[in-house]
Amino acid sequence: MVNMETCAMDCCVLKALLAERAHKCLILDCRSFFSFSSCSIVGSSNVRLSTIVKRRAKGSMGLEHIVPNEEQRCRLVAGMYEAVVLLDERTSELDMLRKDSTMMLAVNALCRDSRGSSIYFLKGGYETFSAQCPEFCTKNSPPVGLSLPLCANNVPGSADSNCTPCGTPLYDQGGPVEILPFLYLGSAYHASRKDMLDTLGITALINVSANCPNHFEGHFQYKSIPVEDSHKADISSWFNEAIDFIDSVKNSGGRVFVHCQAGISRSATICLAYLMRTNRVKLDEAFEFVKQRRSIISPNFSFMGQLLQFESQVLAPSCSAEAGSPTISVLDRGTSTTTVFNFPVSIPVHSGANSLSYLQNPITTSPSC
């Protein structure tokens, strides 16, 4: 049953609130992370409830899941918001929603736990609001990378003066792509192009390889993750360090470029782990989000398996800050055990990776990236 304290708010009313008293209004967007990241109302926050969290909550969701930002949650509990407005894609009546939908769970939690704030849902959702009030919305089209010349001839700071456009591998074409405003993904070639990095405002690089050089150590901050693109490699033990590094650069106002040799497997894995942890999303959602920006990403079987294990830890209600360094990792450093994952089901095997070509995988993986 819908809580009667929740009323519909027309788009024109929200527009007036944002124009006059935006600091008194908390907007909670209940759409998927992918939809929210592509376009959203200015100043809104995304409510992300995983299937695991929903199932374990049994209809009674804690406020910490609805408003993960601690500062906003404290302001809400203290009654400092006049209005809390929830929205999804296009709902016009709350009675149309399932009881276990993200917005209904959020409505019930807010009506139960908020203090002194009126709870509303936006009539017509983001679809209607963006059509009527586009000036209060942000829209981020999937970046396609830089349109810079492929040849590094005569480019100051270039590490390679002999490249030619002819025969340039696909993974080196174009430029680094924006995953988030402070996070970029690309190849070792891109990492050797100081002009590209400077154009993007890059201040730090994560080098996810054991043999790619750090070309400009006097100019950029570097973080090295010496992992081979191998089914025996343990990349998950580096997730926490990489995530902390990205966050530290972000918090200082900088931008991070993550690369391996081709920008397909190892560096993509790090970006996926970052999205999963910081946005509490499933692997398939993070994968689709990154693939929209760099279509050739293809983490190897083992890395996909480690990401799946990471997903179960990230989305568990009791997950801790140590989730990126599990007590029992998929592959222990230094061991020779091989585990191949037929996404999304893990299959431990004892034969060599080369003998497993018969395994079919809906997500193409690359043997060497």
From Swiss-Prot:
Entry-linked SUPFAM superfamilies: (Phosphotyrosine protein) phosphatases II (SSF52799), Rhodanese/Cell cycle control phosphatase (SSF52821)
Enzyme Commission number, as recorded: 3.1.3.16, 3.1.3.48
Cellular location(s): Nucleus
Molecular function terms from GO: MAP kinase tyrosine/serine/threonine phosphatase activity; phosphoprotein phosphatase activity; protein serine/threonine phosphatase activity; protein tyrosine phosphatase activity
Effect of residue 260 to S: Loss of phosphatase activity. Increases stability. Enables stable complex formation with active MAPK1. Abolishes threonine phosphorylation. No effect on phosphatase activity and MAPK1 binding
Reaction catalysis annotation: O-phospho-L-seryl-[protein] + H2O = L-seryl-[protein] + phosphate; O-phospho-L-threonyl-[protein] + H2O = L-threonyl-[protein] + phosphate; O-phospho-L-tyrosyl-[protein] + H2O = L-tyrosyl-[protein] + phosphate
Outcome of substituting residue 168 to E: Abolishes threonine phosphorylation. No effect on phosphatase activity and MAPK1 binding
Catalytic residues, chain numbering: 260
InterPro entries named among the record's database cross-references: Atypical_DUSP_subfamB, Dual-sp_phosphatase_cat-dom, MKP, Prot-tyrosine_phosphatase-like, Rhodanese-like_dom, Rhodanese-like_dom_sf, Tyr_Pase_AS, Tyr_Pase_cat
Cross-referenced CDD domains: DSP_DUSP1, DSP_MapKP
Summary of the tissues where the protein is detected: Expressed in XIK-2 kidney cells.
Entry keyword annotation includes Nucleus: yes
Phosphothreonine found at: 168
Domain Rhodanese: 21-138
SS bonds (residue pairs): none
One GO biological process term: peptidyl-tyrosine dephosphorylation
Superkingdom to which the source organism belongs: Eukaryota
Hydrolase listed as a keyword: yes
Cross-referenced SMART domains: DSPc (SM00195), PTPc_motif (SM00404), RHOD (SM00450)
Induction trigger: By serum stimulation, heat shock and oxidative stress.
Family: Belongs to the protein-tyrosine phosphatase family. Non-receptor class dual specificity subfamily.
Name of the featured protein: Dual specificity protein phosphatase 1-A
This protein's encoding gene: dusp1-a
